[in-house]
């Protein structure tokens, strides 16, 4: 073929390419999702942090679920001045966490929280927009500054328990610091892809 003609003086290059190709084997299982994992540093888990409305004991929680709950408890104190919040706030938080946990999305929230924290610590303005603003968990993590209960925002617009699609949290990052945040995510989490959406008329 064309490559053989182009590399006729280097037949071993063609042979080696074929040999490498024959050794490659990739099987992708599209029946399940592959979500990123947030590795919770052991020292970050507070042994004495309690979760008054959690449906199961702490010992049965995965690390990412426990850490997300812990951050939400601190978020209640930050946003409302106390963890002893109204039943309405507590019910909304538990409803959201139940869906997030059942869809194995705790790590995703933690990763977004992590790079937003990094951005703020480096003076880079950052914040959520779109349906992700309608989450109590996002509000408690500081991803956005809109109380979804106060403004009647629906969690289901972001993450419907009856639908299988994976949601995403749209985060706006200041242009001046965006590359620094991307570099941080790439350095910390490894496999990072930049996605673009093209609209057509």
Where does each model-flagged region fall?
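Non-catalytic structural connector segments
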Residues: 5-125, 131
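Short, well-ordered loop/turn and helix-capping segments at boundaries between secondary-structure elements
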Residues: 19, 23-26, 142-146, 160, ...
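Short, well-ordered alpha-helical packing segments
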Residues: 18, 113-116, 138, 156, ...
